[in-house]
Amino acid sequence: KEKNMNYKINRRRSFKEWIVEEYEATKLLFRSIPAGLLTLFVVAVVTMNILANKTIVQTTYLALDGGFLISWLSFLAMDMVVKHFGPKAANKMTVFALLVNLLVCFIFYIVSIIPTPYEDYTVFNQIIGGTWFILLSSAIAFISSGFINNFLNYGIGTMFRKNPNGKTAFFTRSYISTFVGQFCDNLIFSTLTFMFFAPIFWNGFSWTFIQCLTCSLLGALVELVMEVLFSPLGFMVTKKWHKTGVGEQYLAYINRKI
């Protein structure tokens, strides 16, 4: 009997079993993540990609797009989910937000190409229709930086063995992972959009690498400041989650022994 139990525990799952378990875990996860946080996260992701269409500052050594004004909220939400549910859960939430963003962009594009007999909607169509390479650059940057942020946040958290649920642990892991993640997000997006695609499709408009680098650094610093301002709220919310048992069913499912 003991031998059979060890076999069940140690045997490798089949691909079908893995798919079924991941499906069940994902269903439980999205039932467990508070709807308010998930909504804010998705709205932030969709909004920052629309705002990224506008360059608000451009000098010889500096350039900033509008997306940095809201992107900090998405990283704070990811940090909170990593802390309570784990990095895998945050990655799934990141992928979900990306898929929603792609759907919204597709709907915007369809609306932008529908002809209308009324006033000129050229500017409106350009804004909501977006540009395919901005969407592509944004998707690559977001998914890459999201995964970097989530795993880095979790990794730093494992270093706090004495008081992993304390303020110091939460703030340290959030600040470091947010700065690194935001820098990667900004650099990947600005390099792909303004150095690779824009010179080809925007009549020669472009940023230099110095501008991309300074944009990435300054954007990460500004977003870090926002994280510092609002992370105490994030800490209090995650502490309340722990106290009230938010996501217990999901956590029990992923921590069970097979």
Language-model region placement:
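Cytosolic juxtamembrane regulatory segments of multi-pass membrane proteins
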Residues: S177, G181, L251-I258
